[in-house]
Amino acid sequence: MVPNEKSFPRGGTIHSEVKTDDVSLNIVFGASQKKVKKAPKVKENLLSYETEEQNGQLEAFSAETLNMDTLQEDMLVMGVVKELTATALQIALPGRMFARTLVADISDAYTRVAKAAMSGDTSEYHDLTELFQLGRIVYGKAIKTEKLDTGRVSLLLSLKPADVHGNLHHKSIKKGFIFSGAVAEALEHGYVIESGVQGLQAFVPCEKPAQKLHVGQLAFLKVKTVHHDTHQSTCTCVQVEQDQLRIKSQNETNLDYILPGSIVKFKVAKHLKDGLKGSIMNESFSAYVNEHHLANALDTLDAYELNEDYNARVLYVMPLTKLVYLTLNLDIKTGAAVAKDQDEEEQEVEPIKVGSVVEKAKVLRLGSGGVVLLLNKKLKGIISYGSIRGNFKGNYDKDEVLSKYGRKTKHKVRILGYDVIESLYYCSDDPNVVNEKLFCLEDINAGDLVTAKIFKKDDKIKGWSVRIGKVNGILEQFYLAPNVRYDVGQSLKCRVLEVNAERKICYVSNRAEYLGKGIKILTDYASAHVGNVYMGTVVRCEDTYVLVKFGNGIKGVLHRQNLKENSSFFEGQTTKFRILTRNKDQITLTLPEDKFQLGEICPVEITNALDAGLEVKITFAAEDDEEDEDGNPKLEEFVGLIPLRLLSDHLELLHAQMRVHPAGSYTDAACIMQNIFSLRDVPYFSGQLTKDWQSVQVGDIIRSYVKHATDQVVDLMVCVRNYNKPVKVHVKMLRLNAVKNAPVELVPEQLLWVKVLSKEVETKTLTVSAKLTDVWSGDLSDTAKLVEGYLNEVAQIKAGLEEASAPISKYSVGEKINVVFKGIDATTNDWVYTVEGNGKVSALLLSSLVGTAKAPEMGSKHEAVILWIEYSSDVLLISNKKLDIAHISPSGELSTNLIGKAGMKAKVLLKLESVAVCSLKKGTNPLVICPIRLHPNDIENSGSAELRQGDFCNIAFIHDKLHIAVPETVWRLWRGVKRTAGTEVAPVKAKKAKVEESPKQKKTTIEETSAQKKVKAKAKVETKTEAKAIPTKRKAEVVEKITNGQKKTQPLTNGIVKEKPKQNGKLFFEDKTPAKNAKSETPKSNGAEGKSRLPGVSSFWEDDVNQSKEGSSDEDEELNVAETQKNAAKKKRLSAKEKAKAEIKEEQRLREIEERNADPKARLETIDQYERLVIAQPNNSISWLKYIAFLLSNTEIEKARALARRAISTISFRETQELRNMWSALLNMELVYSNNFDDVLKEALNCNDPLEIYISVVDILKKNKRKDRLSSVLTTVLNKFKTELRVWPVAAEAYFWLGKSDQVHNLLQRALRALPNQEHIPCIVSFAKLYAKHDNNDMAQTLLDDVVTSYPKRIDIWSVYVDMLIKAGLIDSARNVLERAVVQKLKPNKMQVIYKKYLQLEENHGTDATVAKVKQQAEQWVKNYAKTVK
């Protein structure tokens, strides 16, 4: 306790009546717990502290030790290094307090060296463990800091000489002065010392070769010689050890120059109740020694005789009273060495570990600050009064509490810690502390099962801080059990994974995988035997390896090349791993044997929903037939993953499937490999036996999925057991060129079917083909089943959402609803609505359906019809057009008159990822669903190549119950592939067509028919012009040749059957749409052949007789040809009047086409229109960009890329800006859709101004959010073009976008160093605008204020400054700037600008009075200027 200072009032000393406070500042005992002043008592009270003045001299009658209340700010205190790390020291202070010292608090020289080390120069850097040792005595300035979150006060101790010696003056330095200095510079002949004393230069010569100090290191120094001057003094010093810091009594008379840690002579004058009172420096200063600071810990006060001198070390000096507090313990030891302080003859006592329990601790006395104990007969301990008081709540009696601590009584205590200055152990007898099993880290081992209690959320690790008994723990994000709600105060059963002694913390996990019985945890390298299986957690996933973490921080690497199968991993995945090899602390892992085989269908429980997919758990009986405690069969749990792509065959249903499979739900999943399962493959594996290597035969069609895909080769994993090799398929072998330059996009886990071409038994390899014609028969009924499965999956998702009471599940496709308009999406221009009566469900009207319509008013209500439902995002895709509302009805079965019908006119309303939604033009019908792909291997989307959103097309139905259709051209193409030659007159299904004649007779008949047709058609051909060759309607025609019960298709060419080539020929040709009045030159049918048949023969082989009776556009081609010939004959005999009308009609048609093409405002919808646009404006980059955007909207990436190249070669080289626009577009495409960005960038830099290209690249990378690439580009730009002014604002803007706003100011300094002086002002102004743009108005004002101060005549800067302040709403600041501007001495034209700006400000934001004031000031300035001119 600090003694109260005596006041010295003017007029002499008034001796007041002596009063005593019976109040303890450390502990309050008694029933009332109030501080009450009482009269002094005769009997001695060991718990009360007398702090009175008994006489006229300034003195204290208590040698109380230091505490947080008596410790004053900036007070110099001695400390001892108790713990140290590379970057911080923990220092023990008097009073059992602790302080921390950081790197920046050592010395200015060490701070400089540390900064250099951070920049890469580590030549002079040594961490704190090299500069300090445990037990090292230091002194420094104490600084109190309060933590904002807890309010607790902690201490920092600054050892910097400038802070410690800042109040000393160089003229007062004498020979023999001892201080702590830092090495500022190491020279050949000695060290320059950083003393911190004003005006003092210190130097230490290298007298001893073994002496080696580092720059920044602190050392105790003693002044050997000193030379004083008026403004500066120099001294030579020698280094001394901490046990040689003695100061002679006659040397120093100023207490400020006796620094803590110094050794002085202490003369005992009086025994106090809690220590010794005496004096130092020949009785010049009063000094005190607390009873806990005696030479030996167990010494008593009676051992020190009065008027005797003892060596003592200065602990601290109270700043106001100048009372000195000392310790007689000169040889301060750490806890490990405390037991060796006994006599040599006595046996050494083992030190007590912190956290251990002492069963019989004997009470010696009630001392100052607590109950003094004797531990293990030789060591000293103390139970603080605060600890005793904490055991009681409410009122209690002091005497009763302390009565149990009578002399020689014994107590069971736990060691809490050791104080190196007082040489004692501080303890606790609290039963909760003593009986706690888990008190310190030594009580916990990795692998233990413990109960942890959550006490705080840790956002840094995205986990929780927990407490296990009295030990702190961390529950990291990777080790959190999924689907568990966490709250502060919650208790969790956890497994200890790591015990970190350095951080004094342990890491735990409550995942079910770690809590299972019999789980093996790898906790030390000695147990890591090859072949053992341990539970581990994936902490990092890379392309070539997976990093796995076990217990106690042990890590292992799982190389993907060591895996037999392509296993998928994700960060946080916890599973078992087998040790493959170990080399010291390097562990290589592999996976244990598979629990499940390929195709095995298992009941799984969804445990967690991840970004990568669904985490599942499978529970099954253990293989060793063990039983649990209740006698039930022991169960094992296996954890796996269903990747996102394996939830469904259709991309748009993946996230919807995740919604209907929440955590805790159960379902069936098929094993694909090791721990990877699939939902989409369950129907396939449940419907047939899974093939293995022995059962695979050439010709089999097998399911597979993409493992890896490049532009050239695709790696496929086939679903064959015991065959783990990927099979390679060339991308060109997948294409049929059904759509020219159609992009091929293959992603991992994508489904493909393959046909086995060969099987090599010796090498155990399969050769396969994934070409569409190899794996698909061309039967459109298979396509119909594919779409039917898609619709069934959508229905299942809807049913699952209905069970979860999701609002979106109430709606159906084709249903009419009322919606409320909410606005237009700025990115997609789609119209956004909400459903009336259900605000949780939003509706979307796509911009392609909006057309040129004007947006309605906000909040207006409209009627709409649902076109499709996006269950993954709770969005209804709607149409508000009256025709769609009238023509669309809810879903139902297909009417009988539409079964198999073709040529129906329909409008494409939506084009989704898997299907296109169409509406029939006539009548009220449900929506028609068209597949995007005819088959999973239809990678070119040939089934929907002609479908464009918003266009009309002809469709043909391919399902007999559902509204499923394909474009008519696709239907005719694949129908023609299937028909035989004998049934060409009328379409016949292939399975029921029976031809009795032999192949040879069949060929003869066809040739005869062809010859007859040629003769009959010869006259007609000669009468017509031969300038045009009109193609037939059919793209390809084949004849089915029946041999030994098997069908073989062979193409027909001019009526002659050709041999089928060995390889499959192209089924698609890029022909234009057939003309309506096409003239057939093939021998398949003609008018004469139709007449030679008996009635009904044409439909004899057909299944559906009604098909031949329908008079729609799906009639047979033979009938169309006959009608065409008759119509052609009639047209030859047109009258003159009919010819004139036909010419007029044709002229009108051509005029309409020309007007439409000439209208610049017309919406471009076809490639021909865009071609005309770019031909008309070849140097206009906007036209080319519109064309490219049109192609990209149709996912024709290659065409768009080629068009950009074509534009670059077409635009004139003089149009540099237009060319730059095209290069920017090409770079943007390569960045988004390809991986050739760097190559295209090099090409662009060679063909354009590099600076312009780099600036465009920065914008492109920002728009595409490529932060990593942007940083490297900025580095390149700033190095290459640092003398260009334009570069720096662009880089600053990018820094703001990257979130590096703190580095913008450094960037400005770099810019000013690199740019010439004349460009400094524009650069500063640009940066100021950027600061203002990003709401950092203070920095912007600072920059502009400096400019206008230095260059007051720059009117443009004044204007920018004022405009910026007005825009930020800082009107008063803008007014102050203008008031500064108008007092400048400027020319009239410049002053006119200033006053106009001033007047405009007051008119807009001021009052009439301020406006009048500005006008008056302007008039006055004009008058004054006129006088000066005269």
Swiss-Prot record:
Domain of life per record: Eukaryota
Stretches with biased composition (Basic and acidic residues): 1057-1082, 1135-1145
Start and end residues of each S1 motif domain: 74-160, 176-238, 261-329, 447-511, 531-592, 697-771
Deleted gene: phenotype: Lethal in 2nd instar larval stage. Enlarged nucleoli in larval salivary gland cells.
Signal sequence residues: none
Taxonomic placement: Eukaryota, Metazoa, Ecdysozoa, Arthropoda, Hexapoda
Protein task: Involved in rRNA processing or maturation during ribosome biogenesis.
A Gene Ontology BP annotation from the UniProt entry: rRNA processing
Segments annotated as HAT repeats: 1161-1193, 1195-1232, 1265-1297, 1299-1333, 1335-1367, 1369-1404
Stated name of the protein: rRNA biogenesis protein RRP5
Composition bias type Polar residues, residue spans: 1043-1053
Annotated Gene Ontology cellular component terms: nucleolus; nucleus; small-subunit processome
Keywords for the protein's UniProt record, in alphabetical order: Coiled coil, Nucleus, Repeat, Ribosome biogenesis, rRNA processing
Any one GO molecular function term: RNA binding
Subcellular location: Nucleus, Nucleolus
Region (Disordered), start-end ranges: 1041-1145
Coiled coil: 1119-1157
